[in-house]
Amino acid sequence: MSQNPVLILFELFVMVLAISLHDATQSWAANRLGDPTARMLGRTTMNPAKHFSLWGMVISPLLAIFIFSNLLPYGWGQPVPMTYRNFPKKNGEFLAVLSGPMAQFLAAVVALIALLILKHTVANANASLDIVEALALRVPIRVDLAALPGIFPVLLLLYLSIMMNLLLCVFNMLPLPFLDGGRLIVHILPYNAAKAFEQYSLYFMLGFFLIGGYVVSIVFGPLLAIFTVLLSKL
């Protein structure tokens, strides 16, 4: 698959923002719920440098793009540190962890609303949405860059924000020990089951590398389709 360098830069930019939003939200929520650990480490910021992970923000996205030719790069930041005993309520850590993927889902909703506003208020925005969608989904098309309206880069960034935030929301909710889904499951399972889950984490990771992409696509595809239909019909 041929790669458009400008599109890749847009995707990586949106991915880094989505990861920073996820980590900053978890850090802020943990602090509000009683655990200042992440705040004291400067993690309640959208500054990507505070959440940087070489593997999650550089190696994994580049592998996804250039080796596996994924539709979108995906990644993660440094794990947000939380100290369970600092939470005054038993479900404090659970809610703090859940806030990350929920923030990404809400970001996708906000991007959709922004696109709808631009669609109905800015000249040529509506006519450009088909091109935006085709480029974002890597559909081969011929585009006359000189004929595109000035608002086009904003439209593309917003549409990619929908895609990226939905993708990372689904990805983060996978039941793997190093992701939010795994951290949430540990809180739900009985003690012995949670210990067994952590003990066999290596096998879960192996399973992810084998079928993780398929599992993500099962949820991500229909979610993106719903947002795309809403964008076209409203």
Where are these regions (language model features)?
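Hydrophobic transmembrane alpha-helices and their immediate loop junctions
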Residues: 1-234
